[in-house]
Swiss-Prot record:
Gene3D superfamilies: N-terminal domain of ligase-like (3.40.50.12780)
CDD domains tied to this protein: LC_FACS_euk1
Chain positions recorded as ATP binding sites: 252-263
Gene for this chain: lcf2
Xref: InterPro entries: AMP-binding_CS, AMP-dep_synth/lig_dom, ANL_N_sf
Localization in the cell: Golgi apparatus; Vacuole membrane
Gene Ontology molecular function terms on file: ATP binding; ATP hydrolysis activity; long-chain fatty acid-CoA ligase activity; myristoyl-CoA ligase activity
The protein, known as: Long-chain-fatty-acid--CoA ligase 2
Enzyme Commission number(s) from the entry: 6.2.1.3
GO biological process, any: long-chain fatty-acyl-CoA metabolic process
Gene Ontology CC: endoplasmic reticulum; fungal-type vacuole membrane; Golgi apparatus; lipid droplet; plasma membrane
Domain of life (superkingdom): Eukaryota
PANTHER family, alphabetized: LONG-CHAIN-FATTY-ACID--COA LIGASE (PTHR43272), LONG-CHAIN-FATTY-ACID--COA LIGASE 2 (PTHR43272:SF97)
Domain description: The FACS motif is required for catalytic activity and substrate specificity.
Species per Swiss-Prot/TrEMBL record: Schizosaccharomyces pombe (strain 972 / ATCC 24843) (Fission yeast)
Amino acid sequence: MDIKDYYCVETKDSKQPGESYIYRSIHSAGKLLDTPEDGVSTVYDLLCTAAKNHGEKQAMGSRKLIKENREEREIIRKVDNEEVVEKKLWTTYELGPYEYISFNKVYEIALALGSGLVASGITSETTMLFFAATSAKWFTTAQGCSSQAIPIVTAYETLGEDGIYTSLDECKSRAIFTDPNLIPKLLGPLKQSTWVKLIVCSSTPSEDLVELVKSTAPDVEIITYDNLLSLGKEKPQPPHPPKADDICCYMYTSGSTGKPKGVVLLHRNIIAALGGINRILSQHINVKDYVLAYLPLAHIFEFIFEMCCLYWGGVLGYASPRTLTDASVVNCKGDLTEFRPTVLIGVPAVYELIKKGILAKVSSMPAHRQKVFSGSLSLKQYLIERNLPGSAALDAIVFNKVKAATGGRLRYCISGGAALAASTQAFLSSCICPVLPGYGLTETCAGSFVLSPEQWHLYANTVGFPIPSIEFKLVDIPDLGYYTDSSPPRGEVWIRGPAVCNGYLNRPEDNKAAFTEDGWFKTGDVGEIAKGNTLRLIDRKKNIVKSLNGEYIALEKIEAQFFTSPLVSNVCAYADVNHAKPVVIVNPDENGLRTYLTKNSGSSFNGNPNDTLTNLCKDSGVQHLILKELINIGKQQRLASIEIPEGVVLSDFEWTAENNFLTASRKVKRQVIVAHYSDEIQKAYSKKH
């Protein structure tokens, strides 16, 4: 298929005052796509089609936990020139090999689980909350729900008790699918809820946990996944297939600001999104591929891509962020090197970690080998950009060793969830395989825009073209100075089509603000029309701040560039109308920082690189060095002068979803971080570096 086939076109006579043209994929210029094929209009249809088409082929694999090892290790650090011994609890895991089940088996299991739910009183008139880690059991139970037209409700593992109760109460969930280790977080909501009657555990909970549930909610029955499966086989029920307009899922957003909202996704929305993604990527991802499944299934990105994989006939390999690498397992390989995926999906934070890991290994090499790597990287990028031969030879000599860390056979990576720095995309696409940026939201069923593998280097720093099941336009934002009649056109991205959701549950004001009467969803993202009618994202409307001199600063754009630094584990930018430039709050990468300080000791930093992280973060010399590093990156990436930070605040603890500094999809919670460091931010503005 020719590259030009993926271009999108302006819809004739569609331009209105204050708006751009309406753009569509060339594949859907006449009519938007709403299915991958005739006869598939629901998730249950998808399951049946997958079993029919792929039969006894491997569908998904999982690893059994053999042993969990906990040990206390001593770490020696120097504090004020004295050695201090710190104790830290380390957990490692011993896992078995991947064990696989076929597409026919997935179908059989799903029908049995659906039967078991009906036998337990869970029907299409109720809902089932999924509050668990990503696993084959999660996915097959959800498929079981679809076989009986039972709507599911998704909640992140990191959701607090208030959020769990809200989702239970709003959706009137009668059943919960969960993991034993998450049961304690359910006790509070169970005490409040009158709806829940059944808890399905992915594995057998301890007697203590069972007693806790019984004492908290005596009317709630606990059953294991295996026992539910057996019950369904003993009491089989005929499938009760859903209709296209039935609710498939209430998917709760991760809530980077405010209260999580339940996005109402109909079966036809999910199938339309799958149809659009399939039209673009099925030329490249197929029955021969192995896809690593480790992102939260409560996130639309993972949810939709697993549905796509089911349809394509690829193999899903379930994994955990805790056991991805060889470093966190014993007597076995990590999930990446054991499963050896050919396709990897991830959020920018994952790809930044991979890049930093590669660079850390390179920096430990002798100087001549570092030069070989750097020269080979530059040469390969040159060859790719000009479509010249020679890349395979460079892979064989230099880059295959890098690829081995991800299993050695990756063909494509797909990035979503937030903006990926163009430099990171180019680096990994040269070292490992093409990294394809995409863009979508929960409200649009994820992949609304994507680049095809042969296009990544042609349309750098864009999110690609619209899939054939949506159309989009830009709308003026006068308050921020973005206009669609500028060159290039800029404005808020609005999306419409069969993949767009049915609104938010019980949020009339939010629905009124986000959706128009003629079906447009206002994404809140600011974009511009780039080369070939691709879409380039600028930032979220809420993250664009007017500075002292009246110019606007896009905070996420700044963060995406600084995230690439080996000194940075995470970053949050702040700007306001009282200052001309931003301040950046940095959670340092501890190993990267200590290595950097060792190499640069004696400049503005005269302390001990092995001091505690807390002391290093308070050190003005360290602050100066990190600020200098960020300023240099900003200049290299051609940030505007108003986007170059004027100060830095260093955070001495890891930002996680558990401590409420990140969402479950690893986006920074800006309001929380800024509130926590408000005093330090003002001090950073007052310093003269």
